[in-house]
Every structure is written in structure tokens, then in C-alpha cells.
């Protein structure tokens, strides 16, 4: 099964979404990377 990338997911603020994260992580509201 392929890992689903959540970078750019709606719960992340646009400025965080624009930055993105590596390794399939997503930006939280503090612009910190976390695993979904």
C-alpha cells in the first residue's frame, strides 16, 4: 500500500501548506512537521 502524503491537507494553514514537509509529514497550525 502506498503511503498517503498529507502535505497540503486542509487542516494546515496555507503558509504551512506552501512549505510542506518531507517524509510524508504535514505542517500543523504552528508550522511544525508531524506524522498524520
From Swiss-Prot:
Disulfide bonds: 6-26, 12-31, 16-33, 21-36
Marked site positions, Aromatic residue of the functional dyad: 34
GO cellular component: extracellular region
Keywords of this entry: Amidation, Disulfide bond, Ion channel impairing toxin, Neurotoxin, Potassium channel impairing toxin, Secreted, Toxin
Location of the protein in the cell: Secreted
Residues with the Cysteine amide modification: 36
Coiled coil: none
Basic residue of the functional dyad, annotated site positions: 25
Tissue specificity field: Expressed by the venom gland.
Top-level taxonomic group: Eukaryota
InterPro entries linked: Scorpion_toxin-like_sf, Scorpion_toxinS_K_inh
Gene Ontology molecular function, alphabetical: ion channel inhibitor activity; potassium channel regulator activity; toxin activity
Family: Belongs to the short scorpion toxin superfamily. Potassium channel inhibitor family. Alpha-KTx 23 subfamily.
Function: Voltage-gated potassium channel inhibitor. Selectively and irreversibly binds (K(d)=2.9 pM) and blocks hKv1.3/KCNA3 potassium channels of human T-lymphocytes. Weakly blocks hKCa3.1/KCNN4, mKv1.1/KCNA1, and hKv1.2/KCNA2 channels. In vivo, high doses (200 ug) produce no symptoms of intoxication when injected into mice.
Domain observations: Has the CSalpha/beta fold, which comprises one or two short alpha helices connected to anti-parallel beta-sheets stabilized by three or four disulfide bonds. Has the structural arrangement of an alpha-helix connected to antiparallel beta-sheets by disulfide bonds (CS-alpha/beta).
Miscellaneous comment as given in the Swiss-Prot or TrEMBL entry: Negative results: does not block hKv1.4/KCNA4, hKv1.5/KCNA5, rKv2.1/KCNB1, hBK, hERG, Nav1.5/SCN5A channels when assayed at a concentration of 10 nM.
Record protein name field: Potassium channel toxin alpha-KTx 23.1
Taxonomic placement: Eukaryota, Metazoa, Ecdysozoa, Arthropoda, Chelicerata
Amino acid at each position: 500500500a502506498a503511503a498517503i502524503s498529507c502535505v497540503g491537507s486542509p487542516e494546515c494553514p496555507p503558509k504551512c501548506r506552501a512549505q510542506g514537509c518531507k517524509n510524508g509529514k504535514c505542517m500543523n497550525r504552528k508550522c511544525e512537521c508531524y506524522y498524520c
